[in-house]
Structures are given as C-alpha cells and as structure tokens.
C-alpha cells in the first residue's frame, strides 16, 4: 500500500487540529462557483471541523486495520479505491453548504456504500447491497424533492406554510432513510455482509450519521410542533425495536449494528427535544467507541476463521488481555457509565428528558430502551468470556493488529471529557455532584460488597470443603497412602513451579471467578476516581456559590 496516502491523511488530521484550536469560533466560507443556478461552496466551522477530525482518526485506523484483515484478498485495490471515495463523499457532505454539492455528496455516499457492501460477491452481500442502495436511493429522491420544493416556493411565493411543512417532511424522510430510522431500518443489519473494516467505518462516523448531520444543518426548519413530535416518536421506536432485536440476535456483527441503530435513535430523539448540539457531541463520542468495538469484534471473527455466530463463541480466555480490556472499556462507553465519554452527553440527555413531561408510554419505552443497552452489552461480554466450551481460535501474529484500537480507546475515555473541560459548555459536571455521586456511591458499595461476599465466599467454600477437604484429608485417612501422597505432592509442586507462569497466563480469564475479580477491580478504580472528581467539583461549586 502506498505510504503517501497515509501521509496525506495524517496531514489532514494535523490541519484539523490546527483549525480546532485557532478558528473554532470563526465560520469560514470558500466560494468556488457562484452562478444564479449553481453554487458550489464549502463552510468551515466548529461542528464540521470536529466531525472531520473524528472521521480522520477513524479512517486512519480503518485503513491500517484493512491491510491486516483483508491482506489475502485479490480485489484489495478495488476495495481501497471505493473506501477512499466513500470517505471523501462524507467529507464533502460535512463541509458543503450548497444544494448541488450536498446532492452530489449524498449520491456518492450511497453508491460507494453499494460497491463496498458488494465486495465479497456472494448471495448475502448481493442481497445486502441491493437493499442498501434501494433504500438510499429513496432517500436521494426525498432530498431532491426537499431542495426542489424549497427553491420553488422561494421563487414563486406560493403558500409558504404548506411548502415549509412539505419541505420539512421531505427532509425528515431523507434523514430517516440514510440514518436507518424506523421504518427504514431493514437495510442496516443486511449491510453487515460487508467486510468488518467497512462496518466499522459505516456504523461509526459515515453513512448512518449522514442523516443526522443533514437534519442538524437544517435544524431551524424543524422548529414545528408536529415535526418535532414525529422526530421524537421515530427516535423512540427505533431505540426500542433495535434494542429488543439486539437481545435475541446471534450474529455478532448484527448485534453491534443493532446497538448502533439504537444509538442513532437516541441521537434522533435528542434532536427532537431540542438538543441538536448535545446530539452532535453524542455522535462524536459514539463514533470513537463504536469503531473501536467493531475492530475488536472483527479481530475475534478474523482469529476464529470467519465465525460470526455468537453461539459458537465462549471461553475466549486465550485472547490477549489488552483486547479484552479494550472490549470492556468500549462496552462501558456504550452503556454510558459514569466518567466515560458516553456519559458526558448521555447523562445530560437523560436528565433533560426526565425533567420534562411526556406520555407514560413514551417515557417507559425510552427508559426500557436505555436499560436494554446494558442487557445486550452484558450478553455480548458473557457470550465471549463466560461460557464453558472452546472454539477454534488462531492468534494474530501482528502486534499492530492487537494494539491498533488503543488510540481510539484513549480518545473514547478522555477526549470528550477534555473537550468538556476546555471547549464545550455542557452542564453535566454538576449532575454528578448533586445527584449521581451519592447514588453512585451507594450502588457501587452494594455491588462491590455483594460480589466480594458472594463470589469469594462461594469460592472459599468450594475449594476448602469440596476440593481440598474431600480430595486430601478424606482420601488420605481412608486409604492410608501417606507416602504416595507425599511423593505425588512433591512431583506436582515441581511441575507447578516450572510451569506456573505459562499456565497462569493461559488460564487467567477462563473462569467466572477471575472475570469477577477483574470487574471488581475496574469498578473500584472508577469508585476512587469518582470520589476524587466529586470532591474536586464540590469544592469548585462551593467556591462559585460563595463568590
């Protein structure tokens, strides 16, 4: 692969960082063509720069990941070219501010996704590609009607109220088809027949986010009670049905895809309640940890000889510990646990939602949809590491593939928090001090105490009464083979002494006990960190109130 492409992408990444720090408060526009019937210009402002920075980071990771995941494919040059077209069309959609450039970028995004899903050229990929392109072409039609009705009503001064309502409806339908909202959600699980690097890019920061980016660019046009109600209802239905489907789905990639669909519904609901900027921040954090999650699942599929059925995965204790830790951290971010990047936007959205008055059925569906996020995340983790059969598993010899998503994991944990401290104005910090910290302390103390008493006590009772007492003392007193037991103990001790390191490293994560110990240690770390941060912000709040 040509190294100049990586250098070009890295240069764009550095330029995006420069623009964030020095022109974050300025909106720049560059005009290339300006005629009466055709205008081509790009706009550079804070949202487009931030999204392009995250897209560049994810694209670099996907490019490197593709060189290892698809190293033996014959059509790799075709894949690489279509991937660059796909990413370039998303960049063009982000920075475009004219009808012509936006339509061209929108069409290129759907067409390139068709060729990428069609990469493996089998029955599943052909069916998924056709489903994807037909649904996206329907969205292209809605977007064309939206721009046409807007221009027509502005030129001929017809019934503006009717045309504004029609334009808003076409805008919603176009964004619903591209972001796979209800009832246009069928193409997203079928698009999982594409290679896993493409799934990582599509479900993090490109195709499914394009509809939300479009509706955020025209957020002033949806300030209508009926339009907002449609957005909220569609977002809640998408969350609920995708979360329920993720609980019963067995295909690993489809489970992660349905979790993406649930988060897109969550972001659409956030736009509906009037928090467009908060929804944008949630998209940024989701792009980071979801691309990392897809890479880790793709690594496990690649090492398991392409096996995607979750029922055939279990007891993957031989997976490198760093991959297991990354998978756990990304699932924490997906659930929006405290002091992760997902919590920066998710907790504020939940607080804002439950501080308003909605219908009981509507609020219950939203609550259960959020709660089911923990359900399918735990099911995914349990299916990997907490069962008792053994799959065929081949390790990757590449260190780069094992540690590729490290940068995405670090950004998933610290980047949004750093932005919230330095650049954003999201009042989510005081939520922890006023409400979440006491509740967090109580819940964490109860959970840690229950796990320690339940697991450690059961382990001690089993090891002492069942294993050690029955096999050692009772066997020796009954058969009086003290000398044989003594020699056998010496032999066993010697073998254990020489093979302890290898045996421990291979069997560390195979049992429920050790998994529970690791989870308890991670939760204890979060507890200590929460105590320190809560004390710090409590002091800051008292100083602010005193002033």
Swiss-Prot record:
GO terms for molecular function: NADH dehydrogenase (ubiquinone) activity. The chain crosses the membrane at residues 3-23, 45-65, 80-100, 101-121, 132-152, 198-218, 227-247, 264-284, 319-339, 352-372, 399-419, 430-450, 460-477, 485-505, 512-532. The gene is ND5. Belongs to the complex I subunit 5 family. It comes from the Eukaryota. Pfam families: Proton_antipo_M. Keywords: Electron transport, Membrane, Mitochondrion, Mitochondrion inner membrane, NAD, Respiratory chain, Translocase, Transmembrane, Transmembrane helix, Transport, Ubiquinone. This is NADH-ubiquinone oxidoreductase chain 5. It comes from Ascaris suum (Pig roundworm). It is a multi-pass membrane protein.
């Amino acid at each position: 692969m040509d190294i100049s492409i990586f250098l070009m992408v890295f240069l764009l990444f550095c330029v995006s960082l420069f623009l964030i720090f020095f022109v974050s408060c300025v909106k720049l526009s560059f005009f290339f063509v300006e005629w009466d019937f055709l205008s081509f210009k790009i706009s550079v402002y804070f949202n487009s720069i931030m999204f392009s920075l995250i897209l560049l980071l994810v694209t670099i990771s996907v490019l490197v990941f593709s060189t290892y995941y698809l190293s033996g494919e014959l059509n790799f040059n075709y894949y690489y070219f279509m991937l660059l077209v796909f990413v370039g069309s998303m960049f063009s959609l982000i920075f475009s501010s004219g009808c012509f450039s936006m339509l061209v970028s929108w069409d290129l995004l759907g067409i390139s996704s068709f060729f990428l899903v069609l990469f493996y050229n089998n029955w599943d990929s052909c069916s998924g590609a056709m489903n994807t392109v037909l649904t996206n072409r329907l969205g292209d039609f809605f977007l064309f009607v939206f721009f046409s009705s807007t221009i027509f009503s502005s030129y001929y001064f017809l019934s503006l109220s009717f045309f504004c309502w029609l334009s808003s409806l076409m805008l919603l339908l176009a964004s619903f088809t591209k972001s796979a909202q209800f009832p246009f959600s069928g193409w997203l699980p079928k698009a999982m027949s594409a290679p896993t690097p493409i799934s990582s890019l599509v479900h993090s920061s490109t195709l499914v986010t394009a509809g939300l980016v479009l509706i955020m660019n025209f957020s002033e046009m949806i300030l209508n009670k009926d339009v907002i109600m449609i957005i909220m209802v569609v977002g809640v239905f998408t969350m609920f049905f995708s979360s329920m489907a993720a609980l019963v789905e067995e295909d690993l990639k489809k489970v992660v895809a349905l979790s993406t669909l649930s988060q897109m519904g969550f972001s659409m609901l956030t736009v509906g309640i009037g928090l467009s900027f908060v929804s944008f921040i949630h998209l940024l954090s989701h792009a980071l940890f979801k691309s990392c999650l897809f890479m880790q699942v793709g690594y496990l599929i690649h090492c398991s000889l392409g096996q995607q059925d979750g029922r055939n995965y279990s007891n993957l204790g031989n997976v490198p510990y760093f991959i297991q830790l990354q998978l756990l951290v990304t699932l924490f971010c997906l659930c929006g646990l405290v002091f992760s990047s997902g919590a920066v936007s998710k907790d504020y959205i939940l607080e804002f939602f439950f501080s308003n008055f909605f219908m009981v059925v509507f609020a219950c569906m939203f609550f259960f949809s959020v709660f089911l996020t923990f359900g399918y995340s735990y099911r995914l983790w349990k299916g990997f590491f907490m069962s008792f059969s053994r799959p065929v598993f081949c390790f990757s010899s590449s260190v780069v593939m094992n540690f590729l998503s490290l940068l995405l994991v670090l950004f998933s944990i610290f980047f949004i928090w750093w932005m919230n401290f330095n650049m954003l104005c999201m009042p989510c910090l005081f939520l922890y001090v006023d409400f979440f910290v006491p509740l967090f302390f109580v819940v964490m103390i109860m959970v840690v105490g229950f796990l320690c008493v339940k697991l450690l006590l059961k382990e001690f009772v089993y090891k002492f009464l069942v294993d050690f007492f029955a096999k050692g003392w009772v066997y020796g007193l009954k058969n009086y083979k003290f000398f044989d037991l003594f020699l056998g103990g010496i032999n066993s001790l010697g073998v254990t002494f020489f093979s302890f390191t290898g045996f421990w490293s291979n069997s560390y994560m195979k049992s429920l006990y050790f998994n529970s110990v690791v989870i308890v240690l991670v939760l204890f770390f979060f507890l200590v960190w929460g105590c320190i941060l809560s004390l710090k912000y409590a002091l800051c709040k008292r100083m602010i109130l005193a002033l």
